[in-house]
From Swiss-Prot:
The record marks E201 as: Mediates proton transfer from the protein to the inner aqueous phase. The lineage of its organism: Bacteria, Pseudomonadati, Pseudomonadota, Gammaproteobacteria, Vibrionales. It is a multi-pass membrane protein. One of its GO terms (cellular component) is plasma membrane. A motif (Selectivity filter part_2) lies at residues 144-148. The gene is clcA. The chain crosses the membrane at residues 31-67, 75-98, 122-139, 146-164, 213-230, 251-279, 286-307, 328-347, 353-374, 420-436. This is H(+)/Cl(-) exchange transporter ClcA. A motif (Selectivity filter part_1) lies at residues 104-108. It is found in: Cell inner membrane. Keywords: Antiport, Cell inner membrane, Cell membrane, Chloride, Ion transport, Membrane, Transmembrane, Transmembrane helix, Transport.
């Protein structure tokens, strides 16, 4: 043995065999927490980005099949119904069979986990949410990928703490929140919104400390870097770059916010009604649940052919609306139609979120409001597109009750940084009116409903997790 080998052996003899594990698992070490937060953010970025690509692949493949092989064998409408029904069936089956907590957006589950009242079975949630979401969103249903990405990001955070055997409760909590922030940052290419979503919307559950906030920031940054490395650095929504509106028009944004505040409260209540209605239909019976979901998927396959504006998450619809190709009456009809389709899809328990559908609704009503104001007040030089962007943030703020997140989210998604003042006015107006009307934030409402109506599952899951 050489002298160098003896020195190396002597050094290694004093190093614990699981040195890395011990270093990272010491929850009291701030540096180790930040390292794990970077790992969580990176993994959440990959999961969120490839989830988006997977959904896009399924949608494109479905379209190609309709144009070629299947479309030439069966009538086009029948082929569209069958393909979308099959995709929806896959999503509903995976959820009901393997991970019921993966139904819906999943954000209430993460909030419940941060309060230690819901488990995180990441080994089930990650594959079910990923592949189930591919099926449900790929079928053309009005669902967003943002909620699922937040839940999968949180699941990644819990996975990392389990892999490194982290015992410290505060560290586990911080990394769970970090994963949620990373998931949203990757879903919207919006790191600031991802950070603020955890700090603002999850404020009842989030344990504020310097290390936890730093962990959330690092995770969001890493997730966004991964997203941009794969998808590029362009904004998620390509829209015109608007200038700040005239000061004499700002009162219109306050009025728009008030209208969204009223609608946000009504919309949240309608979501609960829709969920309860679907439960009354299928009564948690798997066959009824799958049949209902498949029929719903087939209907949206048909709508994809004839009224595509009423299908999908709505991100692609937003820039189309701001081109000015739709009349005010058509915008109102599309708004009403998408309210109905959003309630049907999200209320059914499909593995999909409601972020993107809400942004589309805000755009439709906001643009219709701006176009109407332009007709009624021609001397004010009103740009309807500015009201469309303000509407995106206002409906989010009214329903989620997170105005700062809504402002940052819209700005980052559209790159319209000059519109921060009208966004602030509209979002704050929406939140104030919603609070005055006594409405609950949507995710708190959904979590409360889950805890109330699903107590048996809540008691069983920790046993399954422990096993």
């Amino acid at each position: 043995m050489t002298k160098r080998e003896r020195i190396v052996k002597s050094v290694l003899a004093h190093v614990p065999k699981d040195a890395i594990n011990q270093f990272v698992s010491r929850g009291s070490t701030p540096f180790s927490v930040l390292i794990m937060a970077a790992i969580v953010g990176t993994l959440a970025g990959f999961v969120g980005t490839y989830f988006e690509l997977a959904v896009h692949f399924v949608s494109e493949t479905r379209t190609e099949w309709l144009r070629s092989e299947i479309g030439s064998v069966l009538p086009l409408w029948l082929a569209a119904v069958l393909i979308s029904a099959l995709l929806a069936f896959i999503g509903y089956f995976l959820v009901h069979r393997f991970a019921p907590e993966a139904a819906g957006s999943g954000i209430p589950e993460i909030e419940g986990a941060m309060d230690n009242i819901r488990p995180v079975r990441w080994w089930r949630v990650l594959p079910v949410k990923f592949f189930g979401g591919m099926g449900a969103l790929g079928s053309g249903m009005v669902l967003g990928r943002e909620g699922p990405t937040v839940q999968m990001g949180g699941a990644v955070g819990r996975m990392v703490t389990d892999i490194f055997r982290v015992k410290d409760d505060d560290t586990r909590h911080s990394l769970l929140a970090s994963g949620a922030a990373g998931g949203l940052a990757a879903a919207f290419n919006a790191p600031l919104a991802g950070i603020m979503f955890v700090v603002e919307e999850m404020r009842p559950q989030f344990r504020y400390s310097l290390i936890s906030i730093r962990a959330v920031i690092i995770s969001a940054i890493m997730a966004n870097i991964v997203f941009r490395a794969i998808n590029g650095q362009d904004a998620v929504i390509t829209m015109p770059q608007y200038q700040s509106p005239a000061l004499q028009t700002l009162w219109l944004f306050l009025l728009l916010g008030a209208l969204f505040g009223v609608f946000g409260v009504i919309f949240n209540k309608l979501i609960t009604v829709a969920q309860d209605s679907f439960v009354a239909i299928h009564k948690n019976d798997r066959k009824r649940y799958l049949i209902t979901g498949s029929i719903l998927g087939g209907v949206f396959g048909l709508l994809l052919l004839y009224v595509p504006q009423l299908t999908g998450g709505g991100i692609a619809l937003i820039p189309d609306v701001t081109t000015g190709n739709y009349s005010i009456s058509i915008l109102v009809l599309l708004f009403i139609g998408r309210v109905v389709t959003t309630l049907l899809c999200f209320g059914s328990g499909a593995p999909g979120g409601i972020f993107a559908p809400m942004l589309a609704l805000g755009t439709l009503f906001g643009y219709a409001f701006g176009a109407s104001a332009d007709v009624l007040l021609p001397t004010l030089d009103i740009e309807p597109g500015v009201f469309a962007i303000a509407g995106m943030g206002a409906l989010f703020a009214a329903t989620v009750r997170a105005p700062i997140t809504g402002i940052l989210l819209v700005i980052e998604m559209t790159n319209n940084y000059y519109l921060i003042l009208p966004l602030i006015i509209t979002c704050l107006g929406a939140v104030i009116v919603a609070q005055l009307l006594g409405g609950q934030p949507i995710y708190s409402q959904l979590l409360h409903r889950t805890l109330k109506n699903d107590k048996l599952r809540q008691q069983d899951l920790p046993e399954n997790q422990a096993s």
